């Protein structure tokens, strides 16, 4: 199953939802698709969707999915990576009035640079990016939070030893 995640902010991502509808109607995508569409105004015709989900519903849907297509929300990305799911990030872009700036592009590129996921910036790339995400062996996501905690604990322990 492909799980599309568009988050909870006030911004739409109709461009992606329409493209997925088109791909399903042309049999480019044949597997089940489910979407969390947030505040997008386009309502999919060829796949099921909800606007919003509880955290429990979200986590259960991530677990059932094989691949996630998500806006570039850090929480969504990290949840998918921790669940060892293939991820295609489709960031909202300022030029399409999908966000006020291109910070989602910056986030997507940072995760892609570490080989955690695949980024898709334009509609004509999505089919190839989906195939690439299915074939790629990604690096295992390691939370930087744990590294910071270890550094702090190491520092505290060294300070106590020196006293």
Regions found by a protein language model. Give the residues of each.
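Nucleotide-activated sugar donor-binding and catalytic core shared by glycosyltransferases
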Residues: 1-163
